[in-house]
């Protein structure tokens, strides 16, 4: 009987026990998964809506409960349209995430982006998922490192420095105009001005930042590194979204992303070689690298890694925003012949010949300058928010205490198109930017101080003055040499564009007719 018990009954009992244990584990896992899912899907969103410190701020409950709705809108590239709808519905301050507030009012610039004031206001840092303080560039640098880098680099963006850089800049603008004459076929061919403005600005800024141009104008094509950047605008911004909201890693194309990292790393090696080649030169070039490497002291210096990273930053940030703005201006000029006519008249009333047009003299072009401001208001190069987070201990924004780790920011396009602050906000009126006495009275109450396309405060774009001078100079010489006309292909160019940190733009196809020499005198 004992033998029978061992051979027959024990295996059955053991099998039964193992089945029971397996069943219990499966049940336990099921319960745990159910509880976790319930917490994520139901409990946490309800907690965010009903008990979160930001619950008093207006906004859709769906967005207050979870960051997922925002993330999906951002993925579509249409967040700039959605956030405008939300502000139109809920007002100037909207809760767009469990821990995020969007401000669309001019008064918020100082509180969100203003400088650190001891015993009064702390600086709101950039989120680490947006700009890492370990990136060795000015964008994400700590308060102390940012101040050191900016003091080193500021002399490269003064009026005096710009005058010294002008001969180098002129070389690229001359080549830009020469190439356009070759491709326009006397107005019979369509020309993609997005491409040509991009070639020009990247060659120009690349030469100032790296010591040599990318060869875009010479070769009539983008450098492979720039091709990589522009071909992957969507993926790079989804990677940024994933760093913020890990849920969206589910939507990241893994194969494309891995290839992107490999390609970027390969180009980084090549760019480092370019910088090393430039730093080995002993002849002064009056470029950004001259400034970055001059007058080193124990407190005023840039490391080699900071030199390299800031060169990339100046190239990408400076060239893309300028080319985007110039392309937007070109489109507007094709749709507003009255504005184009007035700019051309101002050019010929101001300058006796093209040789008189330079980066200093274009400052006197009042209406042209007003047009540039209006074009950037209507079509800002960075349409969405440049994020900040409240520091440890929180901060005061517009008189209200905002708890720490709250994401805050101002969506540029929303603020610049708000009828609350701009007369005829969805129309183009360069005259709103004319000086007092020349400006029509209907625009006197526009909130022009709310227009900050290069950001605000101590971390505003260091190259802002150079960018304005560049745009005036390129636009003036472009319109001195060419008449620009729209094509059916790009008649609705601004409609339905996608936007992330920058616009994801289609080509702008226009017709260019060279202006006869006798007409341009």
Curated annotation (Swiss-Prot):
Positions of glycan attachment: 188
CDD domains in the record: CYP60B-like
GO cellular component: membrane
Gene Ontology molecular function: heme binding; iron ion binding; monooxygenase activity; oxidoreductase activity, acting on paired donors, with incorporation or reduction of molecular oxygen
Metabolic or biological pathway: Mycotoxin biosynthesis
SUPFAM superfamilies hit by this protein: Cytochrome P450 (SSF48264)
UniProt keyword terms in alphabetical order: Glycoprotein, Heme, Iron, Membrane, Metal-binding, Monooxygenase, Oxidoreductase, Transmembrane, Transmembrane helix
Protein name per its UniProtKB record: Cytochrome P450 monooxygenase bet2
InterPro entries assigned to the protein according to its UniProt record, in alphabetical order: Cyt_P450, Cyt_P450_CS, Cyt_P450_E_grp-I, Cyt_P450_sf, Cytochrome_P450_monoxygenase
PANTHER family with a match to the protein in the record: CYTOCHROME P450, P450, PUTATIVE (EUROFUNG)-RELATED
EC assignment: 1.-.-.-
Family listed: Belongs to the cytochrome P450 family.
Compartments, record wording: Membrane
Catalytic activity: dehydroprobetaenone I + NADPH + O2 + H(+) = epoxybetaenone + NADP(+) + H2O; dehydroprobetaenone I + 3 NADPH + 3 O2 + 3 H(+) = betaenone C + 3 NADP(+) + 3 H2O
General function of this protein: Cytochrome P450 monooxygenase; part of the gene cluster that mediates the biosynthesis of betaenones, phytotoxic polyketides involved in leaf spot disease in sugar beets. The first step of the pathway is the synthesis of dehydroprobetaenone I by the polyketide synthase bet1 and the enoyl reductase bet3 via condensation of one acetyl-CoA starter unit with 7 malonyl-CoA units and 5 methylations. The C-terminal reductase (R) domain of bet1 catalyzes the reductive release of the polyketide chain.
